[in-house]
């Protein structure tokens, strides 16, 4: 089976926080799992860099938008690499492949008769001599009264807005009052695909219920044509006849990045023909890891665009959406510096600590909240005391009593039964991962470690070592095999720690099933060191405040 795994493209006007990291980590865990199972996977994402927020920021800084996004793209690429995200292609919307693909794609949709032209009234700034789309306008939200709402969305109540909805609108650049002027734009005829979308959603058993319910509700209410163009300068030029000076709306071009990123991946490999093999084959499944606020773009707009192209692109197999991640019970806020940003997290602890906790508390069915108290508890109790302690006890015993050598012995009945149960837990991990129940899969991994601790305690090899060596040898061999299997599954969630454990087991390369599940392919235990350490929340909070006061990372200097 071929798989396309994708995470939502982060908008790179700022460093992502832990809420964004949840989706990225989730997609990475799933991609790593599929590779472990021998599936053919292309894992993609990229930097979303067009649109008004970046254009406005560049104007304020007196630099070109591309100069700003070059810097941010490089920084965010480094952050994802530092977190162990195993993208096959992390690209950007400024890539030549993406820009060419988007223009060609929309020209095909236009020629198929699914895009039309309409004259509309838009806000215009006479002083700056420009139309004011999206965030080029600020004003009072008509729903909640927030006085600094943007022309595309209110940051307080979350309602999506049009610039003309705002009360007392003002130009974001110069602060002057805009006027209404007529301008021409192009629209995607989304309502035309209502029935095809309804059928696709109703018949897709792999879409989560919350995504199905929301999407079908929107279809029932009646879909509206979607604006395709903007009067921005910073974006992909619209390809339609008479559309000179217009760009493709950032949301409507970035969503096509899932397709263009796969095309770019195979072009880089010199295998251009494989792009269609992946995207236009009935044997390919595509899965998208997103937040619940992005559901409509992935269950309605993106599938409708793929249908409209007439090119036979595979529709989304599943949309793995999550609820919101909060910080100590409240929404993340850059302006109020509430939350933890990715570069700050890396300054506090190694990436695997965050990978572990973000998946452990992944908001799969309801909103979840990061709390320092729970973070401390789960890292210390589950990661350090359960997994780390198991590894230390077994390997220390092998190093001291067996000089690092793994005994070659026939396993007794109890030890064989123990490993059978370990394999059963392994299958539970795999089943949960395939169902994208990542929290349950990680909890099963912890249960495997608990079972190992119980087995080692009950067997007491330190007593048998002198009096019943055969039983002690059987205990140690079974425990060593457990650690190999544990490392194999850990590599999906915490790759750096798993590779560290694999090396301590005296094994080469990275954890693989052929060696992990073998009773004979064993190494020599050496170079022991703690796999994890305990943390103290007070120390981490103090260190975080220090990072911000000193401006040690980019996100701290942005605020």
From Swiss-Prot:
It is found in: Cytoplasm. A motif ('HIGH' region) lies at residues 10-20. GO terms for biological process: methionyl-tRNA aminoacylation. InterPro entries: aa-tRNA-synth_I_CS, Anticodon_Met, Met-tRNA_ligase_1, Met-tRNA_synth, Methionyl/Leucyl_tRNA_Synth, MetRS_core, MetRS_Zn, Rossmann-like_a/b/a_fold. PROSITE patterns: AA_TRNA_LIGASE_I. It comes from Korarchaeum cryptofilum (strain OPF8). ATP binds at residue 334. Belongs to the class-I aminoacyl-tRNA synthetase family. MetG type 1 subfamily. Zn(2+) binds at residues 141, 144, 154, 157. This is Methionine--tRNA ligase. Is required not only for elongation of protein synthesis but also for the initiation of all mRNA translation through initiator tRNA(fMet) aminoacylation. Keywords: Aminoacyl-tRNA synthetase, ATP-binding, Cytoplasm, Ligase, Metal-binding, Nucleotide-binding, Protein biosynthesis, Zinc.
């Amino acid at each position: 089976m071929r798989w396309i795994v994708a995470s939502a493209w982060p908008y790179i006007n700022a460093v992502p926080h832990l809420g964004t990291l949840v989706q990225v980590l989730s997609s990475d865990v799933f991609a790593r799992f599929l590779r472990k199972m021998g599936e053919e996977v292309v894992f993609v994402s990229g930097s979303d860099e067009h649109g008004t927020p970046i254009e406005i920021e560049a104007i304020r800084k007196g630099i070109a938008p591309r100069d700003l996004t070059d810097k941010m793209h490089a920084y965010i690429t480094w952050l994802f690499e530092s977190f162990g995200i195993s993208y096959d292609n992390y690209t950007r919307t400024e890539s030549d492949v993406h820009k060419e693909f988007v223009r060609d794609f929309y020209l095909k949709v236009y020629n198929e008769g699914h895009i039309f032209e309409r004259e509309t009234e838009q806000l215009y700034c006479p002083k700056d001599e420009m139309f004011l789309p999206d965030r080029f306008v600020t004003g009072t939200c008509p729903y909640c009264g927030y006085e600094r709402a943007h022309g595309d969305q209110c940051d307080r109540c979350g309602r999506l807005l049009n610039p003309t909805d705002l009360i007392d609108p003002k130009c974001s650049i110069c602060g002057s009052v805009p006027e209404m002027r007529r301008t021409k734009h192009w629209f995607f005829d989304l309502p035309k695909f209502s029935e095809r979308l309804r059928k696709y959603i109703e018949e897709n058993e792999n879409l989560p219920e919350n995504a199905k319910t929301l999407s079908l509700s929107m279809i029932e209410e009646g879909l509206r044509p979607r604006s395709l163009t903007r009067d921005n300068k910073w974006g992909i030029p619209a390809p339609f006849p008479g559309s000179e000076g217009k760009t493709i709306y950032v949301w409507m071009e970035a969503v096509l990045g899932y397709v263009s990123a796969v095309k770019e991946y195979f072009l880089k490999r010199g295998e251009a023909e494989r792009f269609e093999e992946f995207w236009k084959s009935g044997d390919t499944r595509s899965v998208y890891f997103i937040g619940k606020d992005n559901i409509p773009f992935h269950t309605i707009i993106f599938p409708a665009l793929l249908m409209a192209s007439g090119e036979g692109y595979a529709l989304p197999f599943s949309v793995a959406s999550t609820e919101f991640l909060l910080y100590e019970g409240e929404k993340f806020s850059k302006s109020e510096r509430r939350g933890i940003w990715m570069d700050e997290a890396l300054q506090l602890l190694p990436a695997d600590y965050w990978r572990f906790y973000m998946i452990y508390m992944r908001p799969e069915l309801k909103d979840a909240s990061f709390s320092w108290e729970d973070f401390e508890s789960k890292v210390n109790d589950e990661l350090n005391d359960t997994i780390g302690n198991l590894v230390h006890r077994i390997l220390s015993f092998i190093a001291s009593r067996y000089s690092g050598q793994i005994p070659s012995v026939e396993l007794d009945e109890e030890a064989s039964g123990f490993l059978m149960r370990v394999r059963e837990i392994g299958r539970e991990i795999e089943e949960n991962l395939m169902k994208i129940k990542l929290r349950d899969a990680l909890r099963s991994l912890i249960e495997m470690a608990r079972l190992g601790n119980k087995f080692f305690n009950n067997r007491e090899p330190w007593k048998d070592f002198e009096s019943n060596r055969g039983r002690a040898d059987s205990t140690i061999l079974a425990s060593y095999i457990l650690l190999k299997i544990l490392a194999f599954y850990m590599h999906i969630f915490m790759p750096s720690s798993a590779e560290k454990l694999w090396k301590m087991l005296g094994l080469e390369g990275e954890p693989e099933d052929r060696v992990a599940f073998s009773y004979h392919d064993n190494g020599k235990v050496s170079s022991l060191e703690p796999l994890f350490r305990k943390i103290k929340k007070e120390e981490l909070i103090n260190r975080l405040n220090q990072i911000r006061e000193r401006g040690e990372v980019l996100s701290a200097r942005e605020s």
